């Protein structure tokens, strides 16, 4: 039963990240700004670092295969690391039982750190793919916009969900 539960959670996470990346996006210059990171954060917060890694890796990679296949392999690793990192930090935060204001500040630090790793990963990827860091610098703006939007969406969803009993369950 536990394995089926994990498979269902991972399938839902992959689906949410795929939809929020491939469908809920806006073109900014030559880049797509999407809300996938917000759902990676939600999945990683609710279900832990492995669920964040799986949802980030597979959901984002599938979205890239549908929208921008040249970066799909890189996305698999970048978004997986982002989900894993956020999940590890948020698990640490939850286990410390901080006051709500401190928990929010710590979660903000986790979001910013994870987004920074994502932005660095795509900067290095695009420098490699295009052979020039100048071209990769252009994408920093759209990745920054995407990060800010995703952090805002995460906080909206987090604050809506945090009073629901789902957050208080230990068996997830």
Model-derived segments and their meaning:
Residues 1-172:
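Loop-helix junctions at membrane interfaces
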């Amino acid at each position: 039963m536990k394995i089926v539960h994990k498979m269902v959670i991972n399938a839902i996470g992959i689906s949410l990240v795929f939809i929020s990346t491939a469908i809920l996006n806006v073109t900014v210059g030559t880049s797509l700004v999407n809300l996938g990171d917000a759902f990676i954060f939600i999945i990683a917060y609710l279900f832990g670092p492995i669920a964040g890694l799986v949802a980030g890796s597979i959901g984002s990679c599938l979205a890239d295969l549908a929208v921008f296949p040249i970066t799909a392999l890189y996305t698999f690793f970048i978004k997986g690391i982002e989900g894993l990192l956020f999940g590890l930090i948020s698990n640490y935060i939850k286990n410390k039982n901080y006051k709500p204001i401190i928990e929010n500040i710590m979660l903000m630090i986790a979001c910013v750190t994870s987004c920074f790793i994502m932005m660095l990963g795509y900067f290095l990827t695009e420098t490699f793919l295009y052979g020039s860091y100048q071209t990769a610098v252009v994408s920093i703006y759209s990745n920054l916009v995407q990060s800010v939007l995703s952090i805002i969406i995460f906080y909206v969803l987090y604050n809506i969900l945090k009073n629901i009993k789902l957050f208080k369950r230990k068996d997830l």
